[in-house]
Amino acid sequence: MKLSAVKGALSFLLAASVLGGCSQNPDGLTPVTLNEVAHSIFYAPQYAAIELGYFEEEGIDLTLVNGKGADKVMTALISGDADIGLMGSESSVYVYQEGSEDYAVNFAQLTQRAGNFLVSRTPDPDFSWEQLRGKTVLGGRENGMPEMIFEFILKKNGLDPKTDLSIDKGIDFGLTAAAFSGNDADYTVEFEPHATALEQDQKGYVVASLGVDSGYVPYTAYCAKKSFLSERPEAVQSFTNAIQKGLSYVNSHSAEEIASVISPQFPETDVETIAAIVSRYKDQDTWKKDTVFEKESFDLLQNILEEAGALNMRVPYEDLVTTEFSEAAKDAL
């Protein structure tokens, strides 16, 4: 046998032993840990994939962790506590700008609109963004996607986020709804199910959708470290296939059917409320038809980051986005 053939055989055996030794359970499924930025009905396609068994179909044993914030998700990803992160893609830009060699690469986009809503103390069917002038709003983390989209909308409507209103950015992600109930702020920016919960408790009323008023944006995407993508491409492809199946399901079924499927993920929320929230998201075309993260979307993301003063330099699309897995998942349908 030629030396090159021996080396090739040894390399294959080593790779097989590594994959077999640390990437499969006794049941033959590959364990993958996903850290999500929030546990929200906004990510319904992901939960549909979980509840309908699409991950198991693709050979994935998924562990889901709620990171409660993009900064925490990225920390888990970089440290190795998570294999895949679901968050705003701005986080991958920040890590890349810091000069990390094993940076996070976006491989599948899930949502194409913002998923949060502006909630007022009182009903206001005639709301306009101009009404925020001089008011106090509970916002999001500085340079996080929710806050940047909010400020992007304010600027579109002639408001300076720094001088025309007061934005409280100091409350932890996911705690703003509770804070709003005992706070004197005039408005809060909320994801579901918190926005609907405030309405049901008559403590707040949705007056605007940030998803509608901002337009199409690459709001949340799946990413993994460059090393993970190169070392475990089969797991990434299987994961992407499952997400694509989840997207296809939500785009071809009613809000009521989707709510029934994903309800185990939200035991504290009744099915009717889940259906209403899903309908709200479907009506504004929240979910993509496929997971391909287009260059135009990445350029728009960088425009938003530049406008927010959060971008030191524009970064190459080819470095931070790969469509290899998404294209294959789409073609496999």
Predicted regions and their residues:
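Bacterial N-terminal signal peptides that target proteins for export
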Residues: 1-9
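Bacterial signal peptide processing site
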Residues: 23-25
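Short, glycine-/small- and polar/acidic-enriched structural segments
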Residues: 27-160, 166-170, 186-192, 208-210, ...
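Extracytoplasmic/secreted envelope proteins and their assembly/folding machinery
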Residues: 43, 74, 78, 89-92, ...
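Pocket-lining segment of extracytoplasmic ligand-binding domains
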Residues: 91, 122, 172-266
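Secondary-structure end/capping motifs
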Residues: 230-312
